[in-house]
Amino acid sequence: MQLRELKVIITGAAQGMGAHFARRLAEAGAQVAAGDVKEEGLAQLAEACRGLPGRVHTRKLDVSSEADVGEFVEWAHGAMGGLNGLINNAGILRDGLLVKRDRETGAIRKLPTADWNAVLGVNLTGATMMVRETVAHMAAAGARGVVVNMSSIARHGNRGQSAYVAAKSALAANTLTWAREFASLGVRVGAVAPGMIETPMTKGMNQKARDALVANIPVGRIGEPEDIWQAVRFILECDYFNGRTIDVDGGLSM
């Protein structure tokens, strides 16, 4: 599928990788329905994309709300005059060891269930509802389409990220499940698993910590959103790609 033919939803689009994907698609002439809980970021995205060949439509979206998801997908379909793509990018972190001993008191601390539920609610349940509602619209319209899930190399296991690892692992597994389920509907499903990507947090790291991080990455640098976009673009455009997850991590998980 050519990028200019896309009418695609992007979740978590107010900043970071989601905003970068939206700009790249608008530059290519695609229509984008950008959703996020951060309305200020969405407004900035819309302004940044003004005048580009494509068009970016924005609306507040909380993917952890089933009602929000249904209403957003219905709105996106109407705003763009159709729907043939989804980039499932929204995600949150609530990091912490599942069980740990407090260094000062020696007391045993446990990961709060609320933190677990919050991460799974956005990163897995929310992502699943987005796929369900988007593909249902594609199928009802008889439209061929593509879904790109954002997994993570954390799915290989990462200390202090039980909830995040569980969600991203499940999303990678269901990428294959959904590719099999949706093939008869003309919908492909792929996933990208980013490694360490440049963010305000990594940019604010002290040099010693940053150097230690980079030393573990074979290509010798932290990734940029553009690195991830190149993999996302491949999945969107390659009609013969289906059911697989691409690690884009500079070799960190080798």
Residue map of PLM features:
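Active-site-adjacent segment of SDR/Rossmann-fold oxidoreductases
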Residues: 21, 177-187, 239
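A short, exposed helix-loop element centered on a Lys and neighboring polar residues
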Residues: 131-132, 176
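C-terminal substrate-recognition "lid" of short-chain dehydrogenase/reductases
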Residues: 2, 221-248, 253
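Active-site loop of short-chain dehydrogenase/reductase
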Residues: 6, 81-83, 138-151, 184-187, ...
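Catalytic loop of short-chain dehydrogenase/reductase
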Residues: 107-115, 139, 146-170, 175-184
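Canonical Rossmann dinucleotide-binding motif of NAD(H)/NADP(H)-dependent dehydrogenases/reductases
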Residues: 3-33
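Substrate-binding pocket helix/loop in short-chain dehydrogenase/reductase
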Residues: 97-117, 213
